[in-house]
């Protein structure tokens, strides 16, 4: 299943250029860019992501899974849907980038209660900034962040930065795995 996801990502979501031409969230330019949405929002990609994320969190005894909108939303929703299919339902939640300015003011949207154990997910990590922001906001709302799962680790220190806040942090796919598959597909 993992290799199928890697191949799917290479076909739908991975971009390379000879010169650094892709602007990252950090503002830095890169030769390597991954936009996971075309993969995750495809029915087969959603199935693969959901099941692989659930495999990564199955021992954590979680109540919820989510992260910073928009990158984490399809990952969390795929995992929540897969959790129901697997007979171990976990609720999805989304963390706002800006606080809601009306109604009940909160960062976390979804049916989450203070004290519940959650995993924070993200689609891609470079520096870890977005994932760390999600972890901090989840904790500020009283959630216990027990695990962090990243779909694609660019292997630029982000996963290690996340692990400073959540020691049980892992990635489903690494940049090295994508590069290896990309090179095989190009032959």
Swiss-Prot record:
Q: In which pathway does it act?
A: Pyrimidine metabolism; UMP biosynthesis via de novo pathway; UMP from orotate: step 1/2
Q: Which UniProt keywords apply?
A: Glycosyltransferase, Magnesium, Pyrimidine biosynthesis, Transferase
What does this protein need as cofactor? Answer: Mg(2+)
- Per the record's keyword annotation, is Transferase included, yes or no? yes
Q: Where are the transmembrane segments?
A: none
NCBIfam families in UniProt: pyrE
Tell me how this protein assembles. Homodimer.
Sequence similarity: Belongs to the purine/pyrimidine phosphoribosyltransferase family. PyrE subfamily.
The protein in question is named Orotate phosphoribosyltransferase
Organism this protein belongs to: Desulfatibacillum aliphaticivorans
């Amino acid at each position: 299943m993992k290799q199928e996801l890697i191949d799917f990502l290479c076909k739908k979501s991975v971009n390379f250029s000879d010169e650094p031409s892709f602007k990252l969230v950090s503002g830095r330019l890169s030769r390597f860019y991954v936009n996971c949405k075309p993969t995750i929002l495809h029915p087969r990609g959603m199935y693969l992501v959901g099941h692989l994320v659930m495999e990564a969190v199955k021992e954590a005894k979680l109540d919820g899974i989510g992260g910073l909108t928009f990158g984490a939303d399809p990952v969390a929703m795929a995992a929540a849907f897969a959790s129901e299919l697997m007979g171990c339902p976990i609720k999805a939640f989304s963390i706002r980038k800006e606080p809601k300015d009306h109604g009940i003011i909160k960062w976390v949207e979804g049916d989450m209660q203070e004290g519940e154990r959650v995993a924070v997910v993200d689609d891609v990590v470079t520096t870890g900034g977005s994932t760390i922001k999600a972890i901090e906001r989840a904790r500020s709302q009283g959630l216990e962040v027990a695990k962090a799962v990243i779909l694609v680790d660019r292997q630029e220190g982000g996963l290690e930065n996340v692990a400073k806040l959540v020691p049980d942090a892992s990635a489903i796919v690494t940049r090295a795995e994508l590069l290896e598959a990309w090179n095989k597909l190009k032959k």
